[in-house]
Amino acid sequence: GPSQPTYPGDDAPVEDLIRFYNDLQQYLNVVTRHRY
């Protein structure tokens, strides 16, 4: 399965945080889709 995105850190640029949350949302969608 997909690997869980790693949190870039509180001091990361806003772009990295946005990218992380987008990747996390896609990751959760894939994980929950396969689980049920």
Swiss-Prot record:
UniProt name for this protein: Pancreatic polypeptide
Cellular component, GO, one term: extracellular space
Organism: Meleagris gallopavo
Recorded family membership: Belongs to the NPY family.
PROSITE patterns for this protein: PANCREATIC_HORMONE_1, PANCREATIC_HORMONE_2
Keyword Secreted: yes
Function: Hormone secreted by pancreatic cells that acts as a regulator of pancreatic and gastrointestinal functions.
Top-level taxon of the source organism: Eukaryota
Listed transmembrane segments: none
Metal-binding among keywords: no
Alphabetized UniProt keyword annotations: Amidation, Cleavage on pair of basic residues, Hormone, Secreted
